[in-house]
Amino acid sequence: MPQPIFDRILPAFLYERIATVLLAQASRRGATVLTREEVIASTDAPFLIVVAESFALLLQAEPVPQMSTYRVAILTNPRAIARFLRKIRSQVPVNRRPLIRAVLQQLSPLNAKEQMLPADLAIALMAVLGEETTAQCQSCQPLVTAALNERQAQERLLHQVTTQIRQSLELPELLKIAVDRIREFLDVDRLLVGQFAQTEGELRGQITYESCRNSEIPSVLGIWDDCWQWSGLPSSSYQRLSQGEAIVVSDIQQFYGAVPCLQSFAAHWQIKSWLIVPIIVQDRLWGVLIAHQCDRPRQWQPQEVEFLTHLSQHLSIAIYQAQLYSELQQQKATLEQRVNERTQALREALSAMEAAHRIKNDFLATMSHELRTPLTCVIGVSATLLRWPLGPLTAKQREYLEIIHESGTHLLELINSILDLSEAELGRSQLHRSAFSIRQLCADCLEVVKPQAHRHQVNLRHQLMIPPTRDRFWGDYRRIQQILINLLSNAIKFTPAMGEVILRAWWKEDELIFQVQDTGIGIPAHLQSLLFQKFQQLDSSFGRAYTGAGLGLALTKQWVDLHHGWIDVDSTEGKGSTFTVGLPAISDPLPDPPKPKLDVPPLATTEVLVEPEGRIVLVSEDEATSTLICSILTTAGYQVIWLVDGEVERLLALTPIAVLLAEPFSYGDVQELVDQLRQRCTPEQLKIFILGSKGNYQGVDRYIPLPIHPESFLQQVTMGLTSLATSAQ
């Protein structure tokens, strides 16, 4: 309930002076005025109501017994003023009640909150209230002081309750403490909190909190009484409470003499007098605050009623806050449950998706392995037939064999890309780091793409800004080589005839930078975000003009990420593109390896450099690869013996001119095998080739990468045996 903006005990003449000031102000503003005399209300407490367009004011005066003073209060809350008018309406003659209705109608448009008084009116009131009055009423000073002390005590208790409301949202604890403190302050025998509940259209209530003076006072906690709805409250009383009015009964036996049921109830629970104030939460009667006097009838003082009313208002705030907190906690629990359910559903969906993804990748990997073996044989046999020494091929035969060879090679490259991508996505890709020459790496990559550049009539250049002292890099040679080959191949593919592709390399502090720049068709800005996604071609028109499965750049990105590097693209449509790769340098844990000559002639060369003669021993456990190698070397005129283990004595007993050791090396320690062979044979007597990734094996003459490309493989073997043939001469 709104509190007065002014509440003091004043001499009667000062009240009259305040009323005179208000009447003058109302007359000047054309405001409506209603006084006790106009409605002839049967009350000895004078009042004055002023209602203007922008504010309303109620001046109340309650006589102080045995003193010529009033307790003067000023309220500016329209709702409180309307409640006051409805309260006195029953005491006003019927012919005067239209005056009250008229004032109530004028109050309706005003806001329910306190209105700001006009400045001149506030100044006039302050001038009156500021005058010295104590000299004219010295006899009432002790009573005034006592009243002020009581008021201060009430305000302290209100402050304590308000503080507790702010500090705690636990309603049971708050109400339990509040009823104890209020009972002690009012000095009553029993203080109760009752709560209403609407069930199946019937109003029911129950005492939920209680504080008794001592154990002799019987407890009414949880009591329900059918007499007069609840605890002696008839429907009219319930309506009064709902409107915010208090029920004040000094002597129950006398007041409810005509209600035996209620008299019996009061006698049973030793109730002589009660004071009931409503607890209204959000304009709904939530419950009541009840004070019982059990030893005697009690004349309840206006300040006691007012104090209990103020406390009920603070409790209303606490109850509303607790309800909001409870609803919030319930909503929080509901949301948490929904989040947990949604999270679990997402986990299950993610798990199912990951399982499907793994199955797909496993299937791709399995099928790629199964397809790669026969394709390797097809490529090898077609390459062997192209060099068939027993008779010349017709033009048509050669054309068909070249189609078979090129188509098989293209399909094998696609399958290898799918296999590499599947392994990368499954997290199975591992780097096989070794030390290598950056310049030699670039030379090897340019040599691989040189035939493609020649076919497309594209000028292929390089700019290597690598000082000799920093020509060494520690990384996966095959992966980095494939990164550069993919970028160079794409650049050549999308560069028109007479265009240019440049490979650059330089150090930027501790980062090795590779850059491939072309003068090709460029990439539209809105499509550049798709570059590194698998199975992506930038436009359907590109797919018709340029072949490819859209895996090269996706694999490139995976391999760059494996090296903890980065890749960037800068492209302008119609002018060309620049791809830049940065690879961080890491420490080389191994000593410098020997530097064999790695220059490789163009792959288009098919000329045999020496006359094939002598025996070559192949050590391999892979039947398909071994069959292909034997076919290639036998067709070229070599005698080939295939072993599945690397027993040294058996190898040397065959007196080979070269030993090919193929990955995987499950047949023993390769370095130990090479050392034993080198102890018995010099490089001029025996060549040792590793078929697989480049490593740091001491005593090895040449590394030939897998899978086998027949033309390149034969060139590598022939070149490796050149020095042997020269020394034999």
UniProtKB/Swiss-Prot annotation:
Biological process per Gene Ontology, one example term: rhythmic process
List of residues that carry Phosphohistidine: 369
Catalytic activity: ATP + protein L-histidine = ADP + protein N-phospho-L-histidine
SMART domains per the UniProt record, alphabetical: GAF, HATPase_c, HisKA
Region (N-terminal domain): 1-169
Assembly and interaction partners: Homodimer. Part of the circadian clock (KaiA, KaiB, KaiC, CikA, RpaA, SasA), the composition of which varies during the circadian cycle. KaiA and CikA compete for binding to KaiB(fs). The PsR domain binds the KaiB:KaiC CI complex but poorly to either protein alone. KaiA and CikA bind to the same region of the KaiB(fs) form and therefore compete.
Protein name as it appears in the record: Circadian input-output histidine kinase CikA
Species of origin: Thermosynechococcus vestitus (strain NIES-2133 / IAM M-273 / BP-1)
